[in-house]
Amino acid sequence: MIRALLVAAVWLVTAPVALLPQGPDPVASRAKGRADAPITIYEMSDFQCPYCRAFTLETMPALEREYVATGKVRVVYINLPLASVHKNATIAAQAALCAAEQQRFWPMHDLLFRHQDEWAKLPAPGDYFARLGDSAGVNGARFTHCLSSGATAAAVQADAERARRAGAVSTPTFYIEGGLLEGAAPAAVFRAVLDSIYRSKTGARPR
């Protein structure tokens, strides 16, 4: 079991939970990093959540450079739209999975967070998402049909159920090798957690 770390975030040891997406949505479409990386982070997130945006823009670049690009960590994105407070979060998650069907999840992910302020309060953001999809490099007709038909709605719901089974009640929450890290913690907090896990699993110095 992972030793709980007293850091500037909530770190809870919990039981292992199956979080891999099942069925036609392959995990590879929304994972980054080597499949055999010793550590997997499941990022349970909401595209309309400002704290999730802060993590994506401020913390994730450092983690990508130091852990993902070096083969130590794999990151898997799990949708947890908080629809009661973020009215466009669910359709944004559906749009991201429509892009994932064309292997363009991460470009769409980045655009959704970068332009969050522009679409968050739109009464019907579908057309805006289609423009983001164009920028992400998707086939526009396929993307629009996917989004308008609700083709990915069940996958988003399944994601949310997985996240709740893992113990996530807010966003962002990160399930890391049996523990939960809650909130948009700074890179230093993630380093403390990841370095400890890496040493315990491999016996090697992380950096």
Regions found by a protein language model. Give the residues of each.
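Short clusters of hydrophobic/aromatic residues that line enzyme substrate/ligand-binding pockets
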Residues: A31-K32, W119, L181
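Bacterial N-terminal signal peptides
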Residues: A4-A18
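N-proximal helix/coil linker or "cap" segments that precede and/or mark the start of modular domains
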Residues: L19-P21, E161
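Structural alpha/beta surface segment adjacent to cysteine/selenocysteine redox centers
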Residues: A37, S45-D134, A166-V169, S196-S200, ...
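Divalent metal-coordination and catalytic microenvironments
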Residues: I41, M108, F143
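C-terminal cap of thioredoxin/glutaredoxin-like
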Residues: M44-D46, L57-M60, A130-R207
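A short beta-strand-turn-helix
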Residues: G23-I39, Y67
